[in-house]
Design a protein with these regions (language model features):
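A short, Lys/Arg-rich alpha-helix, primarily the initiator
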Residues: 1-20
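Alpha-helical residues within the helix-turn-helix
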Residues: 11, 23, 53
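Short alpha-helical DNA-recognition segment
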Residues: 15-34
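Residue-level signal for the short linker/turn that defines the boundary of a DNA-recognition helix
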Residues: 15-17, 43-46
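Residues in the helix-turn-helix
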Residues: 31, 42, 61
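Short, charged recognition helix plus adjacent turn
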Residues: 34-35, 63-72
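DNA major-groove recognition helix of helix-turn-helix/homeodomain DNA-binding modules
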Residues: 46-61
């Protein structure tokens, strides 16, 4: 499964709303909401770039792959 760390990154930077993050990054609110709650099925490179630039992080800090032990 893919896990989003957006909530953690927002907390570290004291960003309290997706609306504020949207204004700061130029990423749409609905796209951020899908990443935040884990319902996103794809993320555009431009979205990843904007978020990594804003949070000064690597892709692996934003999202991570966690193997599902039940699928082995």
């Amino acid at each position: 499964m893919i896990k989003s760390n957006l909530a953690m990154l927002m907390a570290e930077k004291k960003i309290r709303s997706l609306n504020k993050l949207s204004k700061e990054t130029g990423v749409s609110g609905p796209a951020l909401a899908r990443i935040y709650d884990g319902t996103n099925v794809r993320i555009d490179y431009s979205t990843i770039e904007a978020l990594c630039r804003f949070f000064d992080c690597k892709i692996g800090d934003l999202i991570e792959y966690i193997p599902d032990p039940e699928q082995d």
